[in-house]
Amino acid sequence: MKLKILGSSSAGNCYLLIANSGQTLIIEAGISIKEIKEALNFDLSKVIACIATHRHGDHFKYAAEYMQNGIEVCSGVETLDSIDYSHKMRVIQKQVKHTIGEFVVMAVEVKHDVHCFSFLIQHPESGLILFATDTMYLPYKFPGLNNLILECNYSQEILDSRLSDGETIDMVRNRVIGSHMSLETAKGFLRVNDLTGVNSIVLIHLSDGNSNAALFKTEIENLTAKSVFIADKGMNIEFNKEPF
């Protein structure tokens, strides 16, 4: 299994899980179909679906474009209802296992400022993947994890420092805190979950102004003793159940 990152920021989020067979599951619809085609050598024949967490543009802007190109888009009904185009749509219900090609996907509801899912994704090659973004916190323990794609949007210390220095305002600070996961919260989530079987942790959706990629990577590595990556456009990561 390979994880290919096409975008991981407020400019657009999109990730490809590519199995050894070539079968591809898209996560998030925040990148244009043109870029999807370029990433897959203009061959969409093995794309089985796109799963999307919520309706905000950096995650869902191009959903209709995907559908128009024959890609089924799967999400919660609240998210799918936000666009007019209804062809190639599939409603995902929370805490129900959905088989999508070689993948099995289960959604869990998380805390954001609109209806939002995180996903548990199972595949024989990758094992159990957690994909979690745009959530204030994760009030769950997930047994049997093998790989994590986890939001680490901001540092509380950096955010508070910028507020003190007049670089941001209370309204923005409060919106960030109420809708995104901090480094401190991500660390708390990792502490209470069993990471014995985890190979890789990919930190996603880092804020341009309120994060520090090198610091975040070091802190999570020191906490977990796992391979930690900071998501960047164009990055390819081996995403297997076994480390080698």
Regions found by a protein language model. Give the residues of each.
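Conserved beta-strand hairpin/beta-sheet module of binuclear metal-dependent hydrolase folds
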Residues: 1-40, 117-133, 146-147, 156
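Active-site metal-binding loops of divalent metal-dependent hydrolases
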Residues: 7-8, 29-31, 55, 78, ...
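Short, hydrophobic beta-strand segments that form beta-sheet elements in well-ordered domains
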Residues: 27-28, 50-52, 70-77, 89-92, ...
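Active-site metal-binding motif and surrounding structural segment of the metallo-beta-lactamase
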Residues: 32-75
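Active-site environment of divalent metal-dependent phosphoester hydrolases
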Residues: 56-61, 81-82, 113-115, 138-140, ...
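Active-site regions of enzymes building and remodeling cell-envelope glycoconjugates
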Residues: 70-72, 85-95, 102-105, 145-150, ...
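Metallo-beta-lactamase
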Residues: 74-126
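Cap/insert and terminal regions of metallo-dependent hydrolase folds
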Residues: 143-234
